[in-house]
Amino acid sequence: MLPSSIQISGEPLSGAEVRDICRGLRDNAVRLLSLRGCRLCDRDFGRICRALAGATSLAQLNLNLGVVSSPSRIKQLAEALRTNRSIQSLFLHGSPLTDAGLALLNPALALHPALVALDLGDCMLGDEAINLICGLLPPDGAKSGLKELTLSANPGITPKGWSRLAIAVAHSSQVRVLNLDYNPLGDHVAGMLAVAVASSRTLEVLDLEGTGLTNQSAQTLLDMVENYPTALRSLVLAENSISPELQQQICDLLSEGEEEEEMAGGAADTQEWGRGREPAAHQRGGSSWKCPSDPNSQMVLMTSGLGDSLLAETEM
């Protein structure tokens, strides 16, 4: 039997449902497990963690929106991840991890051989967490390093922390998707990120929606896109104080670069973005940016789900 998906959202889990989930994990019949916003007792959470520890078919685990709600649950998840070898995408968006909680998880994350996509958006992280995350980016032996990283809505991270992340992305990472939306970055941090993008050989998607940018940083990003060949294909700048004209210019340049790649036969296969990642703001919908001068043209910038697309590549 081919592995299937279990997706439950915002519901209290009964004992019978937990037993079915654990049975599916133990039988290696589950490829995707999503329990976003579900309510369950500590005992049942522990049962699921013990089952996923030995699961060999599980590739995506979504525990967004407060499922990992206490230090004891963080420890149980860390213990499961130390044993598990199959999970490629881990979503913990909206979990009250804090720096201390990520420190508990980090050893398991750092040693996991398959993990390529990590969502730590809205997890109450600060600079100490950034220090740990930077260590997850570069390849290490058989590990490929993270290819998708989401850090949306973590306002406790300071410019010092963001500068450290920018250096890590530029220097040794394999990151293809970087979601930093709804953080108070400002123009100074955006300038450092522009340098990181110009240096990176892999970064394709950068989400800076609602990050306090102005025309100053937009001009820097425009210069970067115009003058330096990069892998960047999608740049999200919505909900910033940036003129429509500058947004249009950046949009046009990114579109031109993609067209040139396609004409040369070097464009990568279209990735299937948007599955698994939570909106950074509770009221927020899809992250898309329409080029201002053409209401019919749209550059779709849903910037998640890389783990799924990588799974598809593996299965082909």
Swiss-Prot record:
<feature type="repeat" description="LRR 1">
    <location>
        <begin position="57"/>
        <end position="78"/>
    </location>
</feature>
<dbReference type="InterPro" id="IPR052201">
    <property type="entry name" value="LRR-containing_regulator"/>
</dbReference>
<feature type="compositionally biased region" description="Basic and acidic residues">
    <location>
        <begin position="272"/>
        <end position="281"/>
    </location>
</feature>
<feature type="repeat" description="LRR 4">
    <location>
        <begin position="145"/>
        <end position="166"/>
    </location>
</feature>
<feature type="repeat" description="LRR 6">
    <location>
        <begin position="202"/>
        <end position="223"/>
    </location>
</feature>
<dbReference type="InterPro" id="IPR032675">
    <property type="entry name" value="LRR_dom_sf"/>
</dbReference>
<keyword id="KW-0677">Repeat</keyword>
<feature type="region of interest" description="Disordered">
    <location>
        <begin position="257"/>
        <end position="296"/>
    </location>
</feature>
<feature type="repeat" description="LRR 2">
    <location>
        <begin position="86"/>
        <end position="106"/>
    </location>
</feature>
<feature type="repeat" description="LRR 3">
    <location>
        <begin position="114"/>
        <end position="137"/>
    </location>
</feature>
<protein>
    <recommendedName>
        <fullName>Leucine-rich repeat-containing protein 73</fullName>
    </recommendedName>
</protein>
<feature type="repeat" description="LRR 5">
    <location>
        <begin position="174"/>
        <end position="187"/>
    </location>
</feature>
<feature type="repeat" description="LRR 7">
    <location>
        <begin position="231"/>
        <end position="250"/>
    </location>
</feature>
<keyword id="KW-0433">Leucine-rich repeat</keyword>
